[in-house]
Amino acid sequence: MFLQINRTSELARVFGIDFFSVLSRGSQYRVESMLLRLAHTQNYLAISPGSQQVASQPAMECQPLVMEPESGFYADPVVVLDFQSLYPSMIIAYNLCFSTCLGKVAPSKANTLGVSSFSPDPSVLKRVKNEILLTPNGVMYVSSKVRKGIMPRLLEEILSTRIMVKQALKRLFPSQKILHRIFNARQLALKLIANVTYGYTAAGFSGRMPCAELADSIVQCGRSTLEKAISFVNAHDKWKAKVIYGDTDSLFVLLKGRTVKESFQIGNEIASAITAMNPNPATLKMEKVSHPCFILTKKRYVGYSYESPEQSEPVFDAKGIETVRRDTCGAVSKTLENSLRLFFEHQNISELKAYLQRQWTRILSGRVSLQDFVFAKEVRLGTYCTRSSSSLPPAAIVATKAMRADPRAEPRYAERIPYVVIHGEPGACLIDMVVDPLELLAMDSPFRLNDLYYINKQIIPALQRVFGLVGADLNRWFIELPRPIREAFAKRPFSAPNAQRTRIDYYCLSKHCTLG
């Protein structure tokens, strides 16, 4: 609790807003607090558009570059390079701001700029024609020699201050824990405000002062910078490198036949060369080397990563797959991570097949922990566009069942509700097979964990998306697996406290045939 108060206090000091507003207000309020204070010192006043003006401004047209990756398994090192604070760097480097924008080269018929009417003065354009920067989306800006923009000035101060705070953080002694927490919260606040400044210009729905042309200029300058970097790396004969994936501000560069140490050396050379190509402060940083790794699709990859050439033991690094996602159960994430580690270390399909068949045998035999098979998904009752309970998500169905038994069991908004999938009647839908884990654990429970659902619908699809890239057919492996004999259920005592013996199926040990 004290740490949260300390962090919030530092955020309030940096943003220049009150304590409660840090918790209750959004990022636009924070940006505007700092932006307007600086604008007033330069004799600027901000416009205050109405909702109709915001809704009627032109739509944004530019998107960041996200390449379609070359999906596959890479046994050779893949260098990951990242532009530090790409969008703030573009704002500073090209002096992009509300106060420096001269409008489009080919103005629209409505003569608008963002949310307001604007027509550039021909005499002004003629006077500063040698100091005009034309961005890739066709919008003109004056250079910093003519006028230094408010946003570039703000971001320069934020980034330089953050560097000083981080340097001071490194000089602290281990015993200075309170100062360490204060400085860390302060540099985090500066990082947050720098990263959301672009979003302030691009908030086209509920924006306080959006400008589509300015937002497009920032995105398009960043996209152009990344495209030039990709072309430069692919065309350089010395490195013999190939960019296999690019995402907004990062590059994945394949170096065939190189060691991890050589990859770090080449990666640093690439970073230095591309940094020298771009205006200050745009900086490409060598982030890590992945060796080996899988690249699945956009924003989904996994591998063993090294952050320095001296690092001996790699770190398991995953993004976008089931090992780091919260919408699956522990059995899926653990099986996938263990399978990946096994394959990365031995790169042997036969060993992987043997491991997975052992895991499937354990699941079919019931020798598993129920905790690994519990889903926990968010429930937002009152937001589902359906009148029938049969169309609700499984977690919402479990929540409504609990509410029928006890109205006080209504979940909070976006609360995660646990549930498991059990065996049902032949042809039963998923919504008829979800129950609270406590119902499955009850002494007189007739339910049994639906092992085939977890294997066929959860584990195999997650693993097939990854290992299908190396030719593995997990469905065939499962079909080839001899089915184990499940141990018989313990006999239910007839002296159980449950007196509701109104149906014959109460006396059955299970609704599922153990011979089937």
Task: Describe each model-derived feature in a short phrase.
Residues 155-172, 190:
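Non-transmembrane amphipathic alpha-helical segments
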Residues 134, 197-208, 245:
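Flexible hinge/switch segments at interdomain interfaces of large molecular machines
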Residues 13-122, 126-136, 146, 154, ...:
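DNA-dependent DNA polymerase catalytic subunits
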Residues 9:
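Conserved glycine-bearing catalytic or ligand-binding loops at nucleotide- and phosphate-handling centers
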Residues 202-220:
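Gly-rich Lys/Arg/Thr-decorated short loops/hinges at beta-loop-alpha junctions or inter-strand turns
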